[in-house]
Amino acid sequence: MRVVILGSGVVGVASAYYLARAGHEVTVIDREAGPALETSFANAGQISPGYAAPWAAPGVPLKAVKWMFEKHAPLAIRLDGTRFQLQWMVQMLRNCTAERYAVNKGRMVRLAEYSRDCLQALRADTGIQYEGRTGGTLQLFRTQQQLDGAAKDIAVLQEANVPFELLSPAELKHAEPALAAVSHKLTGGLRLPGDETGDCQLFTTRLAALAESLGVKFRYNTPIDALAIAGGKIAGVQCGSETVRADAYVVALGSYSTNFISNLMKIPVYPLKGYSITAPIVDAAAAPVSTVLDETYKIAITRFDQRIRVGGMAEIVGFDKTLRAARRETLEMCVNDLFPGGGDTSKATFWTGLRPMTPDGTPIVGRTPVSNLFLNTGHGTLGWTMSCGSGQLLADLISGKKPAIQADDLSVHRYLKDAPGQTRPAYA
């Protein structure tokens, strides 16, 4: 079968790889000059199935109000002038109940754990290298309230059989030796030894090369204008003056997926803006060895070979990609507070990207009411974590195979009755 994939981020490239491995003739189209040059370019570097959880959670609305008045708050909201933004935020608030949180987290953990298994198999099969580390992730608590609150997360981890370690301040140095110098600032930590880290952009680039070796064609620097419709099906992709035709089409355009298919159906995928800095290591002994998550500022600090990536923040501001100096200041403050002298933040590169977020946190993966149109989008902050599993799942669906995990509640159909501005799909 001929399959066209729109988007060459980590999710699109993973889809291409698994579809090609299943025997399909795959073409990937992207407006950028190469793979992983937008959202996948400089993310926090985590593969964290253990932390797969919705942002929409009980208590978040009150925290959001509090954060509005804090200098280094992890969340910011600025109206973008669209009705869609307001509707999306209302939907997110509706998902902040304990009942919906449990359902949504269950979906996310299921896909994230499956994706981890797919990644491990991929690594065993291909030997792909991406400055990866398997040292787990360590969530740091600065207050007793945060430490006490971890009990709820631990209960969820136990229910999902996810290995964990609850560490005292004195024990943190066993996971991250450099924290010995700042342990007096911390009340403890929650370590998930099964999580991994690495450079997502490097991973995506090398996975694209593996996909090319399987026959996948990548068409970069190509405009993606519209989907051509005929007889209730997709007849092609309009790329400038050319129409690219296939048997099946996959939209993996991240935050841009919503507008691109708006004439067919309305999906609630909104851009959640994040920031990162990447600094050269100047003292390896003072740098992290894996990924550390600062619970107070919701910032991840990840070790690459000779670099430190510091990423976080969530801004609900539409498609604004302005680099704000205050955000860089927060990232530098956090890494220098926990790992002073480890990296040279004065030489750090500063980046921002738009994460495609759904109100319930779960991505949209699978079939649509249009028979030959498939979606693989809305992964939020967990795009790399869920990419391999989403790609394999999508390949199974397109190939007519039964997926290895439950997939019906990951599709767009869960949203077609209550997505902003829509009560039914354009093609039922």
Curated annotation (Swiss-Prot):
GO cellular component, one term: plasma membrane
Name of the protein this chain belongs to: D-amino acid dehydrogenase
UniProt-listed NCBIfam families: PRK00711.1
Residues binding FAD: 3-17
Function: Oxidative deamination of D-amino acids.
Enzyme class: oxidoreductase
Gene: dadA
Keywords per UniProt: FAD, Flavoprotein, Oxidoreductase
Taxonomic source organism: Burkholderia cenocepacia (strain HI2424)
